[in-house]
Amino acid sequence: MLRTVSCLASRSSSSLFFRFFRQFPRSYMSLTSSTAALRVPSRNLRRISSPSVAGRRLLLRRGLRIPSAAVRSVNGQFSRLSVRAVATQPAPLYPDVGQDEAEKLGFEKVSEEFISECKSKAILFKHKKTGCEVMSVSNEDENKVFGVVFRTPPKDSTGIPHILEHSVLCGSRKYPVKEPFVELLKGSLHTFLNAFTYPDRTCYPVASTNTKDFYNLVDVYLDAVFFPKCVDDAHTFQQEGWHYELNDPSEDISYKGVVFNEMKGVYSQPDNILGRIAQQALSPENTYGVDSGGDPKDIPNLTFEEFKEFHRQYYHPSNARIWFYGDDDPVHRLRVLSEYLDMFEASPSPNSSKIKFQKLFSEPVRLVEKYPAGRDGDLKKKHMLCVNWLLSEKPLDLQTQLALGFLDHLMLGTPASPLRKILLESGLGEALVSSGLSDELLQPQFGIGLKGVSEENVQKVEELIMDTLKKLAEEGFDNDAVEASMNTIEFSLRENNTGSFPRGLSLMLQSISKWIYDMDPFEPLKYTEPLKALKTRIAEEGSKAVFSPLIEKLILNNSHRVTIEMQPDPEKATQEEVEEKNILEKVKAAMTEEDLAELARATEELKLKQETPDPPEALRCVPSLNLGDIPKEPTYVPTEVGDINGVKVLRHDLFTNDIIYTEVVFDIGSLKHELLPLVPLFCQSLLEMGTKDLTFVQLNQLIGRKTGGISVYPLTSSVRGKDEPCSKIIVRGKSMAGRADDLFNLMNCLLQEVQFTDQQRFKQFVSQSRARMENRLRGSGHGIAAARMDAMLNIAGWMSEQMGGLSYLEFLHTLEKKVDEDWEGISSSLEEIRRSLLARNGCIVNMTADGKSLTNVEKSVAKFLDLLPENPSGGLVTWDGRLPLRNEAIVIPTQVNYVGKAGNIYSTGYELDGSAYVISKHISNTWLWDRVRVSGGAYGGFCDFDSHSGVFSYLSYRDPNLLKTLDIYDGTGDFLRGLDVDQETLTKAIIGTIGDVDSYQLPDAKGYSSLLRHLLGVTDEERQRKREEILTTSLKDFKDFAQAIDVVRDKGVAVAVASAEDIDAANNERSNFFEVKKAL
């Protein structure tokens, strides 16, 4: 398993310019699938090691790194305008849809435009019978996207839109199985398959590069949203929403439900609590004044009748917006839709679903709230303070939106941005909270604050925010900063890099941000002219004339301001549990013996239904591909291995729209063990400290003006068949091909000229890293548990955990004090890391671009390599560290748990076979999904097999259980031995696995994946062999694998991140099963 840890200030534009989830800073976003259930929290981690879908999915499951929440996304600020130009030809493969043809299918053509920014023809249709609007976007992008979006404003915080979003995918009229969604997860080539809930709308998007597969997905989703079984089946509502659980009348009653436990996890995270309070306080008079995701205190108030009525009212074509995008036949799109839409008559639902504007306050509001905190540390230093504004009571014009997004980036977008820099350098807090512009809802919001604030400094933070904004309005911005921001934006637009996220879905979400409010859906897709006008205005009038009035009018002189102070309360989590227990005791006391017996019977009935598999004949109704639709060979990336000045160079000749992508790889093998935990901070220091001639602000601006971004991070992985791990530092950069010389000069400047002399900045890095790790513990405890188990089972896991797990958090606590006591020693250690690692010997350069650019850039690479020093040190260090094998419980203040168990199956003599990937996926999507999520009530449960190390692990996420979940893990071998799958089920599992292996990748991701395979010794021949083994997986392979994974049951280690109460209960039930560590 690859593990990467990046520094906080990564300037990688893959993280900086496209982080889709940045569009939801305050919104609630629910993800329905088992893998997606793990994507939301993981967005707060720091980096992915591969941009691929499969790699992303696998890494997120292990809680590894994706772009930092502190790294600002330009797409966040420009979500309405910065649409990526799809690198396709505009000429469609199919003829246009004529007016007569549309009329025959029941549609009228409302408007039609060629969107040059995405080289696409976009046509807006209206279904004449229902009024449903359809946007049909045609181009040659093979990654086709479909989405249906409903306006779904809740009136309370019972979570009704969220529970419905989970439930409609649990069977429908044409697909009456328990969960057709899971069947699609098992056997589709989807590049995106999910659903999510905003505060005012619910989205159901899918994507695939295979046309047959794509329309299978479309049909299942259309049938699910319009004709779901859940409105007639209370069991689905109980399973996904909430229900009373009573296994025996003598036991206590408990609440169960997937959404209920998901939201318990959400309400255990201080940052999430703050975001919800801010949104609701800013808009108390409309739907944003409640929580669409659901407050755990309110969810049990929701009735099945209200649930059904909400679907009847809002899930109607008249209230829907439908999106198609890609290279498929536009006439076929309408043909498919007409079959569904023609079944309905027009509905008044668009009137009842309209969102009313919140009127601006006449005076500011101040709130003081509590959040659940641990007992460790000085609680008086754990306050949070955030100032929030609702910026307008009317929609902003396009020019103002663009300028506001630009302003947001100038103030907060990089570590050198003035508002961000001043707040973090003030010493008043540890990290930013609620930082920046949020414009995905009807009215834009702006919020900024700090956490880790001392009680006596709370007022000072508010004063500093206001004073800094006044100063920026009065003085304006540095010209270099404005130029750097503009280059950043323009590079982002040209690059069109959405990572593993489908481009068409990015466009859909931007279009829907206006369309859902009955505004022009084309407007968010057209940025060229507004951006050109803004550049012209800045050039003619100066940036101050553009931005200062915005600060003054929308922020400083705006009385619609809500200041929120969050106070730590070590009793809050316990109090909430006691309150819930008291409610349930009263419920039970009010029941008769007959009532209790009936509840126990109903509990058993629900569990029996949940654990009874669908019959094979029912499963056959869910459309799927066959093995004949699957390519027999993997996708090969063109790779030429050569050298420049004696250094190995990998070249990948791919079309990149005149952009050069490069990675320079250095070996960690010679580093002293004691310096390893300093490596992430070393990487951050390279990017965020100045040189002899340049301040870090000047250096940051230079990177923004000349390149598309530079990042530095460590990467570790086991290597199959070897004891020593692969451990590297990777420097990634990108620029226009014509600026490659600037890129390599700046990379050299960062590596060799940055000075480790700024004690106060380094102390900030440590505090920010500690705050970020503490946030990970609360929100992504499964990642912490996985890292901890890996550290017990293999060397690479230990190295990664030292740089990004609980051990790293403990190191940061110690380091915070040491910065004041021994800064000279720390500075010296950072220099020693540089001398040990950043050298020519063992260096590898990876480049991805078109052939001409690769040739032209060689001189720049040669010059860069010539400037690298030779490493005179004495060779590689032997890495042999591991944590002691033991069951461990990490205590945090939480209402839900994260439960893991792992073991090394190679220790049993198991030899890797491609069937292992098929079997692991099948276990996750059947046994663990049914038992841990559906029956157990956890938000997520899955297994993961790291073929490099041999570690097989189980993990659960936002789980109400602990020992019960471990028992489910231990039953997996018996589940496999008792399995009797038919050929159709087996084929589906194989196809789903190939979908992961053949994940859709953009050119930079292809080049990076090829580099990773090179580093790990994975050959194309091995990839072909594994593919053949996947395609020929048999039932016998499942039975044989059962014996291998029994080692996890018999000799595995368990790690839980959980509440003190649940850990105490587990240790009482199984005599000190866990060794306990307190983390927060």
From Swiss-Prot:
User: Outcome of residue 895 to C?
Assistant: Inactive under oxidizing conditions and fully active under reducing conditions
Gene Ontology terms describing biological process: protein processing
Where along the chain is Zn(2+) bound?
162, 166, 262
- Summary of temperature dependence: Optimum temperature is 28 degrees Celsius. Active from 4 to 40 degrees Celsius.
Predominantly, its location class is plastid
Enumerate the InterPro entries for this protein. Answer: Metalloenz_LuxS/M16, Pept_M16_N, Peptidase_M16_C, Peptidase_M16C_assoc, PreP_C
What pH dependence is recorded for this entry?
Active from pH 4 to 10.
| N-acetylvaline PTM positions | 86
The effect annotated for residue 162 to L is: Loss of activity
Cofactor descriptive note: Binds 1 zinc ion per subunit.
Q: Where is the active site?
A: 165, 240
Tell me its cofactors. Answer: Zn(2+); Mg(2+)
Q: Describe the function of this protein.
A: ATP-independent protease that degrades both mitochondrial and chloroplastic transit peptides after their cleavage. Also degrades other unstructured peptides. Specific for peptides in the range of 10 to 65 residues. Shows a preference for cleavage after small polar residues and before basic residues, with a bias for positively charged amino acid residues.
Q: What's this protein's name?
A: Presequence protease 1, chloroplastic/mitochondrial
Q: Which organism is it from?
A: Arabidopsis thaliana
User: Which lineage is the organism of this entry classified under, starting from the top rank?
Assistant: Eukaryota, Viridiplantae, Streptophyta, Embryophyta, Tracheophyta
This protein's encoding gene: PREP1
